Regions:
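Surface-exposed loop and edge beta-strand positions of immunoglobulin-like domains
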Residues: 75, 275-276
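An extracytoplasmic/periplasmic, membrane-proximal ligand-sensing/linker region
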Residues: 35-37, 223-225, 249-250, 257, ...
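A short beta-strand structural signal in non-transmembrane regions
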Residues: 269-275
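Sec/Tat signal peptide C-region and signal peptidase I cleavage site
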Residues: 22-26
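Bacterial N-terminal signal peptides
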Residues: 11-20
Length: 344
């Protein structure tokens, strides 16, 4: 074999060997990075609600699936319906894979209320996946003057919420608009726990509670029928709530696309993302760890014991939904804003 040919062949062998070894090298690099590190699960809510429930389960099970087995801690950064936490992760937060956001539907804030201090672009986050679709319901205390949808037309009912940029405000507002209802919708209750306490005390009659919040933190309320669930806000009825209609079912024809837009965003209320600057090999490792965790029998058993659901989507499916929402027409966005009381 001529010298040049032998040299070319040797170079090709070296290149193939390097390619074959690169995943192992990258994996070792990721393991070296995470070994002895602390990874923070960032939440845009205070302690005590459904996000806190999920975060504690992930903190317990996710570390063993991340190379290097880092410690996981939980950080609460409530405010503006998750926007403050989203801004932090996108900008000043570390871009090395040591901080991960358990997101609200921050994509809605970007599309529907970009002037409310939004400094991130959802499509530039590294989406790890979604672990469920947040199942908001409209729940009323058993002593409240509300037993049917018709009772919400009388103008004497008070519904509480986190903030105008949050689902807890937007869903009741859209329900009121789509069905021609008349009730007072107020803000100022920043967590699920504060809304539940206000409802129990009679300060408010009800709120758009997530099913996970109720069944996870107040299971006795469900068992003892302390709350009345009138409606749920999903594309399809949740299997645990077969007799509770969705707003999409009840919406008139001229509101269907508006309600469907909001309903399609519910998976992002249970998303996991990293900042846009995290190295690709660490993003890949976190995605692999996420999928291993949500398939892990021990994780699923803990979720079952704590009465939270897991219906996960991988990063590719999640990203396809992101693109669909950020690509919605200006006309549809304007009508959605009007329906949720956030028109400019």
């Amino acid at each position: 074999m001529p010298l040049r040919t032998r040299a070319s062949a040797l170079a090709a062998v070296i290149a193939v060997a390097a390619l074959a070894a690169s995943p192992a090298v990258a994996q070792q690099s990721v393991a070296d990075f995470y070994k002895g590190k602390t990874v923070t699960l960032l939440l845009g809510t205070g302690p005590g609600g459904s996000y806190d429930l999920y975060a504690r389960i992930f903190a317990e099970h996710l570390p063993r699936h991340i190379p290097g087995n880092p410690t996981i801690v939980i950080e609460h950064m409530p405010g503006a319906g998750g926007v403050i936490a989203g801004n932090h992760l996108y900008g000043p937060g570390p871009q090395d894979g040591t901080k991960v956001l358990l997101s609200h539907a921050i994509i809605n804030a970007e599309v529907l209320n970009p002037k409310a201090g939004v400094r991130f672009q959802s499509a530039k986050f590294n989406w790890i996946g979604t672990y469920d679709a947040i199942a908001h319901t409209i729940a009323f205390w058993h002593a409240a003057p509300v037993k049917t949808i018709a009772d919400l037309k009388k103008g004497n009912v008070i519904v509480g919420s986190f903030a105008k940029a949050h689902f807890t405000y937007q869903w009741p507002a859209m329900m009121r608009d789509a069905l021609g209802l008349d009730f007072k919708l107020i803000t100022g209750y920043p967590t699920g726990s504060t809304n539940n306490l206000a409802m129990e005390r009679g300060e408010i009659h009800g709120w758009a509670a997530s099913w996970e919040n109720l069944i996870g933190t107040r299971p006795q309320w469900i068992a003892e029928k302390k709350v009345t669930l009138l409606m749920q806000f999903l594309l399809e009825r949740k299997r645990q709530l077969p007799d509770v209609p969705t707003l999409l079912e009840m919406a008139p024809a001229n509101k269907k696309d508006v309600v469907e837009f909001m309903s399609a965003s519910t998976p992002f209320g249970r998303g996991i993302v990293t900042g846009p600057g995290v190295p690709a090999e660490r993003v890949a490792a976190l995605r692999k760890a996420f999928e291993a965790t949500v398939k892990d029998p021990a994780f699923l058993e803990t979720a079952k014991q704590r009465k939270v659901d897991v219906e996960w989507r991988d990063h590719q499916h999640t990203m396809s939904l992101v693109k669909k929402i950020v690509g919605a027409s200006p006309d549809l966005i304007a009508r959605v804003k009007k329906s949720i009381g956030q028109e400019e």
